[in-house]
């Protein structure tokens, strides 16, 4: 796949940003990990929702973990069997050792403080580009675009990309570069969350709700539809 920044020239980027941010203000989803700037808690949430549809029980498990293990030091000394039991309702009991290993690494390598550097954060076990960028963008407002399959789908549709989507868009440098260019300074958190929510609620893999999409007028996929 070959993409470059010129692909954005056909899009009114400032207007697209404004339309998405306006929509997010009234339609964005509400989760407790979005109400904190604690990088550790945001990181834990990202690990929980990685392979799990966000639903009420995820919120319950996250809340319980955040209260029982409020920092990396507490999680690093957790009883692994107890931790697995707390995760079993999500089918994530196998992640108990992974979470504990992550916490131990933060304690041993970074004195118990989640690093604020992208490369350092990605050096932690189980932390890839998506999680690292999400944590720093949502927690600190750093200018990183967040790309998962849902966000990549939006980019492909809006920009009219005809090539096959990469199997792991979160690691695709071209998509990451495009997203980094799209993210507005000062609204990094809201823009990334807005695209994530748009992909979950509106720009669905099948039968997307184009008629209610806030950025439909910027979208080449929408423009190609017979009744658009």
Task: Report the location of each language-model feature.
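Catalytic cores of DNA base-excision repair glycosylases
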Residues: 2-10, 27-227
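Onset of an N-terminal alpha helix
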Residues: 13-21
């Amino acid at each position: 796949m070959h993409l470059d920044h010129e692909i954005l020239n056909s899009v009114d980027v400032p207007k697209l940003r404004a339309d998405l941010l306006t929509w997010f203000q009234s339609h964005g989803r509400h989760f407790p990990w979005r109400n904190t700037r604690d990088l550790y808690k945001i990181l834990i949430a990202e690990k929980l929702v990685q392979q799990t549809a966000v639903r009420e029980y995820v919120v319950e498990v996250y809340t319980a973990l955040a209260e029982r293990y409020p920092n990396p030091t507490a999680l690093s000394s957790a009883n692994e069997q107890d931790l697995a039991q707390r995760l079993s309702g999500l089918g994530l009991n196998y992640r108990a050792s992974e979470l504990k290993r992550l916490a131990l690494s933060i304690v041993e390598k970074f004195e118990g403080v989640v690093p604020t550097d992208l490369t350092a954060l990605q050096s932690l076990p189980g932390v890839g580009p998506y999680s690292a960028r999400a944590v720093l963008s949502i927690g600190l407002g750093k200018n990183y675009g967040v790309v998962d399959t849902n966000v990549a789908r939006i980019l492909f549709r809006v920009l009219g990309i005809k090539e096959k989507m990469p199997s792991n868009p979160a690691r695709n440098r071209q998509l990451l570069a495009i997203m980094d260019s799209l993210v507005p300074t000062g609204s990094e958190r809201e823009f990334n969350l807005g695209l994530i929510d748009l992909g979950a609620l509106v720009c669905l893999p099948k039968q997307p709700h184009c008629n209610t999409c806030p950025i439909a007028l910027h979208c080449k996929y929408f423009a190609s539809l017979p009744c658009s």
